[in-house]
Curated annotation (Swiss-Prot):
Polar residues biased stretches: 62-73, 222-236, 244-260, 300-314, 355-366, 379-391, 468-489
Gene Ontology biological-process entries: aerobic respiration
Name of this protein: Protein GDS1
Function comment: Involved in nuclear control of mitochondria.
Organism: Saccharomyces cerevisiae (strain ATCC 204508 / S288c) (Baker's yeast)
GO molecular function: NuA4 histone acetyltransferase complex binding
GO CC annotation: cytoplasm; mitochondrion; nucleus
Other noteworthy facts: Present with 2280 molecules/cell in log phase SD medium.
Domain of life where this protein originates: Eukaryota
Region annotation Disordered: where it falls in the sequence: 56-88, 222-268, 300-391, 433-489
Length: 522
């Protein structure tokens, strides 16, 4: 059907000025019957090259547009300069600067470290095959070694690594200046590509080479430090300033966080014992012992008259309750070491506060806000009040309840046993096991039955709970002392509380020596 078309095919001729490109046979899309809009859409780069209205179209520019653009892209990419030499470590020059006597004999001395067969064979190869001291690579040494000693192929799966390790170790001994060495060996990088390490046998070392080696080492290290500082200052000056500013910001945030941490730790109950505020020295849970504190501040001196009876106001009661929170927290941790019977709960009207659950000996829940210190310091409790609730048991307070004990947070193995720690623990256990409970039946003042204050009622309930606990612990122990003996026992008990529970003082953690500290943790 194409041959039957009567319309002749329009073939462009040379008269068309668009086809006057004689440099290269580039197909021009403009020569066909398309519009300029279609040309712009199909070849949008023509407007960028300079084909603007009113300008003559340069076919050479159009022909070389793609090639020139690719050349510009290649020119923007940085080229690697493979011919630039690498910066050598100046410390590698130490072995070349070691003084020698000038003699280069055959290495026949088999003293250490040349008592090694591989190293001695390598030295012989260097002496024989490198008389001009041009240096030999590990590959060359390995090939020659296998030719002369085929049995050494079984020494290692890769003999070249073994040879390189032995040679480098020998060179480092020379750089350190060991006096046992006799022969000089140096190493340097080759100028060929790829660069290889060359080893050179230089002869016999001079007698005073040790001093020269140390002096050269110090000089090269100083030179390396100064050159490194100068280059860093020139190239990374801006980065250092930025990093210093960032470091200042980080230091500010760090100091603020440390301040918050110190404030938080100062409010905690462990800040005094565990020394959390001191970031340079923090104590582990092994030191959770009240060294210089007074865990029990009870005034148990006998009252001889009714005039000494005192009642606490609600303000003073709440104040003493707040002061005992930190002590109560520590006593709760240590109460598990003593076997206590299950406590009975008393049901009384009133709301229960959080501070009541932090009592010293985990007393039962009660309606008033009085704590154990309120009960102990009221000094107006007689055995009549306790007998009204529990007639079968006497009311007393044991000193062992507040004795310094190790924390339950200790690891299972505990301290490492030595004479000092064993004696201290034995003294603690002795006081706890031999402490005699103090009965308050004869030394207390006469009880005023008409008094019905909430403090007295709370004290009575506390006395009942304490009598139940201590009577179960000391079951079978019967004592009926007279009033004079009881008064003496109270005085002795007060001395024990005020002077401490141990036969000798426990030193504070700050006064411990390094040897004792090492014995504790090891």
């Amino acid at each position: 059907m194409a041959l039957a078309n009567s319309r002749p095919l329009q073939i462009p001729t040379l008269e068309n000025e668009i086809l006057h490109n004689s440099n290269s046979p580039v197909f021009q899309l403009n020569s066909m019957g398309f519009t300029t809009r279609a040309d712009t859409i199909s070849n949008p780069g023509t407007d960028l090259i300079g084909n603007q209205p009113g300008m003559a179209l340069d076919d050479n520019n159009l022909a070389g547009s793609s090639f020139s653009s690719s050349q510009e892209i290649k020119a923007t990419k940085p080229k690697k300069d493979f011919g630039a030499p690498k910066k050598d470590n100046p410390l590698l020059e130490i072995s070349k600067l070691i003084p020698v006597t000038g003699e280069r004999p055959k290495p026949e001395n088999r003293d250490s470290p040349l008592d090694d067969d591989v190293l001695h064979a390598v030295f012989l190869i260097l002496w024989e095959m490198d008389p001009n001291q041009q240096g030999m690579t590990v590959k060359q040494l390995c090939d020659l070694l296998l030719q002369k000693h085929p049995d050494m192929s079984n020494l290692s799966t890769k003999l070249s690594n073994l040879i390189s390790a032995k040679l480098n170790a020998y060179v480092k001994k020379i750089e350190k200046g060991e006096k046992t060495l006799t022969y000089a060996l140096s190493r340097e990088w080759s100028n060929s590509s790829p660069r290889r390490m060359l080893y050179i046998y230089r002869g016999i070392l001079s007698p005073d080479y040790k001093e020269h080696a140390q002096a050269v080492t110090m000089q090269l290290k100083q030179q390396l430090e100064t050159s490194g500082d100068t280059s860093d200052f020139n190239s990374n000056g801006k980065k250092k300033r930025e990093s210093s500013s960032n470091q200042l910001v980080n230091n500010d945030s760090y100091s603020s966080s440390m301040t918050d941490m110190k404030n938080m730790s100062s409010n905690s109950s462990f800040s005094k014992n565990l020394n959390v505020g001191n970031l340079a020295f923090s104590l582990s849970p092994e030191f959770n012992i009240p060294y210089s504190t007074s865990p029990v501040s009870l005034n148990l001196s006998p009252s001889m008259s009714n005039n000494q009876q005192q009642l606490l106001t609600p303000n003073s009661a709440s104040k003493s309750k707040n002061n005992n929170k930190k002590r109560n927290y520590m006593d709760e941790d240590t109460n598990e070491s003593m076997t206590e019977p299950k406590k009975t709960k008393t049901t009384k009207p009133g709301k229960q506060t959080k501070s009541q659950s932090l009592s010293v000996l985990s007393t039962p829940k009660k309606g008033s806000s009085a704590s154990l210190s309120t009960f102990a310091s009221s000094k107006n409790i007689s055995p009549d009040s306790s007998l009204s609730h529990n007639a079968s048991s006497n009311t007393y307070v044991t000193a062992a309840a507040a004795a310094p004990r190790l924390s339950k947070l200790l690891p299972k193995n505990g301290f490492k046993k030595n004479s000092r720690s064993s004696s201290e623990l034995a003294a603690i256990h002795k006081v706890i096991s031999t402490q005699t409970p103090i009965e308050s039946s004869s030394e207390s003042s006469q009880y005023n039955s008409s008094s019905s204050s909430p403090v007295n009622s709370a004290a009575a309930s506390s006395a009942e709970s304490l009598s139940d606990i201590n009577s179960s612990q000391d079951n079978g122990r019967e004592s009926n002392p007279s009033s004079q003996e009881s008064r003496n026992e109270v005085t002795n008990w007060m001395k024990i509380v005020r002077n401490g529970f141990l036969t000798h003082d426990i030193e504070s953690p700050e006064s411990i020596t390094l040897d004792d500290l090492e014995n504790i943790f090891n």
